[in-house]
UniProtKB/Swiss-Prot annotation:
<keyword id="KW-0832">Ubl conjugation</keyword>
<feature type="compositionally biased region" description="Polar residues">
    <location>
        <begin position="8"/>
        <end position="20"/>
    </location>
</feature>
<keyword id="KW-0653">Protein transport</keyword>
<dbReference type="GO" id="GO:0048471">
    <property type="term" value="C:perinuclear region of cytoplasm"/>
</dbReference>
<dbReference type="GO" id="GO:1990745">
    <property type="term" value="C:EARP complex"/>
</dbReference>
<dbReference type="Pfam" id="PF10475">
    <property type="entry name" value="Vps54_N"/>
</dbReference>
<feature type="modified residue" description="Phosphoserine">
    <location>
        <position position="561"/>
    </location>
</feature>
<keyword id="KW-0597">Phosphoprotein</keyword>
<feature type="modified residue" description="N-acetylmethionine">
    <location>
        <position position="1"/>
    </location>
</feature>
<keyword id="KW-0175">Coiled coil</keyword>
<dbReference type="GO" id="GO:0015031">
    <property type="term" value="P:protein transport"/>
</dbReference>
<keyword id="KW-0991">Intellectual disability</keyword>
<keyword id="KW-0887">Epilepsy</keyword>
<feature type="cross-link" description="Glycyl lysine isopeptide (Lys-Gly) (interchain with G-Cter in SUMO1); alternate">
    <location>
        <position position="963"/>
    </location>
</feature>
<comment type="function">
    <text>Acts as a component of the EARP complex that is involved in endocytic recycling. The EARP complex associates with Rab4-positive endosomes and promotes recycling of internalized transferrin receptor (TFRC) to the plasma membrane. Within the EARP complex, required to tether the complex to recycling endosomes. Not involved in retrograde transport from early and late endosomes to the trans-Golgi network (TGN).</text>
</comment>
<keyword id="KW-1017">Isopeptide bond</keyword>
<feature type="coiled-coil region">
    <location>
        <begin position="82"/>
        <end position="105"/>
    </location>
</feature>
Amino acid sequence: MQKIKSLMTRQGLKSPQESLSDLGAIESLRVPGKEEFRELREQPSDPQAEQELINSIEQVYFSVDSFDIVKYELEKLPPVLNLQELEAYRDKLKQQQAAVSKKVADLILEKQPAYVKELERVTSLQTGLQLAAVICTNGRRHLNIAKEGFTQASLGLLANQRKRQLLIGLLKSLRTIKTLQRTDVRLSEMLEEEDYPGAIQLCLECQKAASTFKHYSCISELNSKLQDTLEQIEEQLDVALSKICKNFDINHYTKVQQAYRLLGKTQTAMDQLHMHFTQAIHNTVFQVVLGYVELCAGNTDTKFQKLQYKDLCTHVTPDSYIPCLADLCKALWEVMLSYYRTMEWHEKHDNEDTASASEGSNMIGTEETNFDRGYIKKKLEHGLTRIWQDVQLKVKTYLLGTDLSIFKYDDFIFVLDIISRLMQVGEEFCGSKSEVLQESIRKQSVNYFKNYHRTRLDELRMFLENETWELCPVKSNFSILQLHEFKFMEQSRSPSVSPSKQPVSTSSKTVTLFEQYCSGGNPFEIQANHKDEETEDVLASNGYESDEQEKSAYQEYDSDSDVPEELKRDYVDEQTGDGPVKSVSRETLKSRKKSDYSLNKVNAPILTNTTLNVIRLVGKYMQMMNILKPIAFDVIHFMSQLFDYYLYAIYTFFGRNDSLESTGLGLSSSRLRTTLNRIQESLIDLEVSADPTATLTAAEERKEKVPSPHLSHLVVLTSGDTLYGLAERVVATESLVFLAEQFEFLQPHLDAVMPAVKKPFLQQFYSQTVSTASELRKPIYWIVAGKALDYEQMLLLMANVKWDVKEIMSQHNIYVDALLKEFEQFNRRLNEVSKRVRIPLPVSNILWEHCIRLANRTIVEGYANVKKCSNEGRALMQLDFQQFLMKLEKLTDIRPIPDKEFVETYIKAYYLTENDMERWIKEHREYSTKQLTNLVNVCLGSHINKKARQKLLAAIDDIDRPKR
């Protein structure tokens, strides 16, 4: 394009812009005419040759418009000019020029219509511009006319109006500043009214207004004053926040939170709140303990105020220890309740804020609120554990500040109950197991309980040695749950029962302490005399609660209210001053013996005063175990020792007889023998009487053992009229069985608190010890059965009978009648004893079974003493035994008769042949060697020869050899 322009320039042509600027030159612009174009086009041409000419033109000719062609060509001339060469070169240039001109002419001719059209458009544009110039000229003329129309007065009026508006705005600003100057009075009033949100709102509005007028010099001082006021409000707000820690008030806390929200410091407020709670715990416990210490000191010495809390706790006296502990827990409860209600407040308002935020559209503000809410929630949840840890440490310090071993049992239980309640609070507060509290009191409890248990074992031994085994007259519907010591079991079944006697909730939902006492009250408001609010009603008014006629006849014995309280306490612990248990005095029992017991009460418990003491002790042990579950195993172990010692005492007093084991009747099972041996090895100190000068080391080794008890000399077991102390034996044995039944009843409760790793001990105790209590009946009542009948006299009568008769007798022998008379006398004596003591059916059956078994074995022994016997004599034996059975079945209801087959089989063995008898001897090893030998000797001569006799005796000797 530049080349074309250059060419046009050289030929005198102008661009369209130049044509517009000088319209006059348009006419003078020479454009090749059609004729010229036609001539150029009509000239014969070779396009290829023309193109080659154009291509042969040097590139420099097409470089820039400022290129000087003449100069370029002149500079190319050689130093020596040659005319022919110059002409040839000139002709070449002309040919090139002609080719270019023709090419340009072709291009111009081709673009001429567009060129003409563009010139027409330019002409039209020029006309429009001329019209616009006329319009502008008219506008300027009218503007000058309007300007000249306004006067100086009008402009002055407008200036005054503007000044008036400015002055009105200034007056308004001055009034606002005046109001701001007086807001400090209103702020003070609002702070006194504890209207913190209103005060902060007002202060912030004042600061905002002051920032609007910051261009006034007086505002800077006002800003400083408002900032000081705001800081003062924050200080008072912090004080108000601290009041929440001890006495939470919803309205008060709502105002405080609204105020902090206005300040945008909700997170800071939560941090401050936790600091205040920590400080409140410290100040509260210190003030409570300090108050009791100063009260007990009896002076106004201020030295205690300078002590550390740990040292201050060591100055609490034993008398004030429990009240101080209760008040300490009350105060700490108030702090934790305030924290609990604080969390409730935030949960409630979080839900409300979430609901309102879901309706709004400010996403940025909602995100900030959610962040603050999440921070506060995490802070509160973390604070639960932190606050409870502080509470535990404070109470632990208090617990360890005093030696609890000097406390009475009830006082110690009271302390444990308070701590247990506190641990329950901790579990509900933050789910903590209160390891700090548990560990701090566990060791003290174990040590205390070991000493207490040792004292109780010695006391139990004294009771057993002074026990006359008389009935303790309790009601027929007696239950251990009626005793004070087991009241806690009824309370524990209802989760809402508390020591402060709150009504039991009928709802099945468990109510927490915080829910129960949220509106008022305190779980540590325990009355010391709470246990005396109810009285026991377990003693029968007359024996076993006989009929109305008996009650009226012996009404003077219906109550023991006239018996001094001192007589009811057979033993007082010299160390603790604690009466062991509530028991009925022996004098009262003697007075009640005058009345007959109602023996029809098949369910009336048989127990003694000592049994009741043991049951009460078990109740106390379970109380401690229920309160302090970590020592459950130790307590249950000590409880098992109480039962072990009672069982061992009953066996020692009434069942120990070495001759029993020689009977071969298996009266004592292997389990019972194992249990007795275990008790003797682990619990009984057999050396205490044999070696009174034992060394200190030996004494320490036997510290956990108890001397074997001795039966009271008042208990007579040698009189035949009383069936050798049958009444005492029944009371003792059945009281043990009753005690075992109570342990069976308590097994689920013990199993529930026993640690899983220790449960095998409990299972073994029940399976090998408690369940063996009823097995003591056999050896104990066997001794009575062995003396109740005169078995030796029967053997003498049987020895006088002639058994080698030659004819069958129709009349039984006299020894049968004598034996039946012995049974009749035994039955009469048994009835006499049953008037004093109810004899349970199992006991009666065992007695009859033992007596019948002994009688039958005595009969076999009598038959084994016979030197000569005929077949008729054997028939007489059968007649005697059948007569005995017939009469005996009228005296007893026991079926089948014990050892009936034992006698019949022995009598029938007389008729066996040699081979049958040999087999019979090997199969019936229940007979003694003497009895088998006599059977063989008596048969000699009748149907057994001497050779067979020797063979049978050898078989008997083979059987007897392993027994030696």
